[in-house]
């Protein structure tokens, strides 16, 4: 390098490592799995930039995700359905946010509500960067002919790219929401008791039918695990789902249904003490991944290539079968074109059992 230019380039390099912004707003309202996927990125960001304060704006019920964050991360919870419904309500929220004097905004959601907030901030001369969901590329995954199953950027990558556009350079290095350890089991021991044998989690439900392994097949897996000597199978079910799996608890000694008794924070603690979680492509897949627990996941209408695998999940633990019609949906909302959901009914319970058993 030319000696006279050395101070110039050295100064520029130092400037690139120094954050331009000191008070940054990060926005992701929903859904639960997508918000969970921000956690590894935000924690890594906060550790890399301890002199910058980050505020996470999200649904109030997702606060437990951020309770173990570094001290330079704050959580601001809102109830959109109750308090901020409609465009006018977004302006009301913006006026409240302005009091916190953010000098940059990262929109990690990219929906109408966050677009409105982004516009308000840009009109007030605040730097805003927004997520690129690359919807056009994802459509090539689900088209009926010549499906392109090249792995897309993960959501973790897309979140990091937004922050890089604001000048934050960092690697996403994350182990668990509880750091290097596990959650405080004594805080929920009055419900789950002490651990004296292998624990596994079973999360048989998802938001859409195209993502749910048929319950009669899942029961075969539960029965095999019970016969194999697993002493505790915690089955995650809520509301109307409970009645659909109550018979399992009555029939198999190892099965215990986990409903809303623990709350999200308690469920994260419980998951951190499990040997493995068996889940669909669902929020529980992501929650368990945040605790560092291995996850065996079942994929039907959706596909890992879309970029929504859990953090640190082993691709070999994604159970799926190859069909010309699969995947047919990015989010699993689409009904089966044949009506039989063969992408799920074709998965052998023995295959699922074998994948889970290797962790016991």
Predicted region positions:
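Catalytic machinery of carbohydrate-active enzymes
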Residues: 1-360
